[in-house]
Amino acid sequence: MIIYLHGFDSNSPGNHEKVLQLQFIDPDVRFVNYSTLHPKHDMQHLIKEVHKLIEESDDTKPLICGVGLGGYWAERIGFLCGIKQVIFNPNLNPSVNMEGRIDRPEEYIDIGTKCVADFREKNAGNCLCVLSTNDEVLDNQLTSDALSDFYKIIWDETQNHKFKKISQHLQAMKAFKE
């Protein structure tokens, strides 16, 4: 089972396309929707939904995947639920770069203080990070600097922030999932 978390643009047709692409490596892909506007509520909702999906699944090696803001959540929720994560262009600092787009960006700071201390050290090796060199939203060199001590980084030379096409990374994801 692969659990897919969308980014800030939850209505993007690219989300459906990514789900279809993910089905090439696992026919059981679950799309979990969340508001994107209320971080504390989103975190509670995502933990509950992901935990429920894991409990209902026979897959002994489920994977959670997200793009942008979905990558932020996939890393954390996957860690908290004990499953591997694949994150594409994760938004590591939504409290800074989501200001003006969501109601309470400061809640991300609060969430960060409530998570397990040094969670990336404890999560080392359980997350695969794919970063675009053409990300028009985030500086992915900063993202790489923050994550490369803990996770394998794959650089993509063609996609932009929304990562419409993930197919070139499916085999790496499949190998990582196993």
Curated annotation (Swiss-Prot):
Protein name, as recorded: UPF0227 protein PBPRA2397
Similarity annotation: Belongs to the UPF0227 family.
Species per Swiss-Prot/TrEMBL record: Photobacterium profundum (strain SS9)
Matching InterPro entries: AB_hydrolase_fold (IPR029058), UPF0227 (IPR022987), UPF0227/Esterase_YqiA (IPR008886)
Entry-linked PANTHER family: ESTERASE YQIA-RELATED, UPF0227 PROTEIN YCFP
Domain of life of the source: Bacteria
One Pfam family linked to the record: UPF0227
